[in-house]
């Protein structure tokens, strides 16, 4: 990725107010993370303050995420909203980052029909942590290593950026991205359905989706093995089929999302002793530890 100079952005509120956002969250078991809730409350407040229409839709107790996403789309298409915004219940974001995404989409709706934010997988790439730690750039703030410790949920578009370099302060084209934070224009689903009539089906879980008996909906999201023998998750399958329609998938590298989850903490005193590592917090390290966790930051 290449860097460019940052600049202040004047939101195009007139264009943004013409949008109607349908924020949908599949929420298995009716559960979400506190950080998701905080982000949602901040976002709702911002949207109301700026006069941008937004409604919320939650789908509880659907264990199959593919079916849940298709139900969300079906209910979105019944509404008058212009854009479906998928945000998963384990994602945390800054409200102003979402406002900026909305601004970009509103500025050029025809171009940015699919816009996504990138978030890390629920894993720690220890080799990346080791490489970053050896660089010496984190000696004064070791907790910042968590910012470079993961693999992101997307695949780059190598044809668009053959040299492997892309700007990070403007939207970039990607091959595939996760649906956990994705804004999609209504027309994308309309073109998708027209191109794939074979994906129409009758939903069987009528209670969860508020469907009438015999009603037909589309499987926009499903897991498949494609013609290159790749196993595609439902979000990557969606991206692949959308790109075949000539619609680009755009991502915003500069916004920061958190992917909430659980982690198993391990510790072995014998190994600590062998490496000369303190079993408890060392006194000389206390002053070096500075909290850099986003949920402790004030909204900018």
What are these regions (language model features)?
Residues 73, 94-223:
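Conserved catalytic core of nucleotide-sugar-dependent glycosyltransferases
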Residues 2-22, 194-300:
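C-terminal catalytic/acceptor-binding lobe
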Residues 80-92:
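Short beta-strand-to-loop acidic/aromatic patch adjacent to the donor-nucleotide binding site
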Residues 1-63, 67:
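N-proximal low-complexity "stem/linker" segments adjacent to membrane-targeting elements
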Residues 70-83:
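Active-site nucleotide-sugar/metal-binding loop of Leloir-type enzymes
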Residues 83, 112-114, 249:
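Short, Asp-centered acidic motifs that coordinate Mg2+ and/or phosphate
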Residues 66, 70, 95, 236:
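Glycine-rich phosphate-binding loop at the start of an alpha helix
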């Amino acid at each position: 990725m290449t860097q460019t100079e940052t600049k202040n952005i004047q939101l195009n509120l007139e264009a943004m107010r013409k949008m109607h956002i349908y924020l949908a969250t599949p929420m298995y078991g009716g559960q979400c993370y506190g950080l998701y809730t905080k982000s949602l409350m901040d976002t709702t407040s911002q949207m109301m303050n700026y006069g941008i229409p937004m409604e919320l839709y939650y789908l509880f107790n659907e264990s199959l995420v593919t079916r849940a996403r298709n139900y969300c789309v079906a209910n979105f298409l019944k509404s008058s909203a212009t854009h479906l915004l998928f945000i998963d219940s384990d994602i945390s974001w800054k409200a102003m980052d979402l406002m900026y995404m909305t601004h970009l989409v509103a500025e050029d709706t025809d171009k940015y029909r699919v816009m996504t934010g990138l978030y890390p997988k629920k894993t720690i790439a220890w080799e990346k942590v080791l490489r970053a730690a050896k660089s010496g750039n984190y000696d004064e703030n070791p907790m910042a290593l968590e910012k470079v410790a993961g693999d992101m949920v997307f695949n780059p578009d190598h044809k668009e950026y053959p040299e492997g370099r892309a700007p990070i302060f403007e939207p970039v084209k990607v091959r595939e991205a996760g649906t956990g934070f994705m804004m999609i224009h209504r027309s994308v689903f309309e073109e998708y359905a027209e191109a794939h009539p074979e994906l129409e089906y009758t939903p069987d879980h009528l209670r969860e989706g508020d469907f009438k008996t015999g009603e037909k909906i589309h499987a926009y999201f499903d897991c498949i093995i494609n013609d290159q023998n790749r196993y595609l998750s439902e979000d990557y399958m969606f991206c692949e089929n959308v790109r075949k329609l000539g619609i680009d998938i755009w991502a915003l590298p500069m916004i920061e999302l958190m992917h909430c989850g659980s982690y198993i903490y391990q510790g072995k005193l014998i190994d600590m002793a062998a490496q000369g590592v303190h079993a408890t917090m060392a006194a000389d390290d206390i002053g070096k530890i500075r909290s850099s966790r986003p949920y402790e930051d004030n909204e900018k």
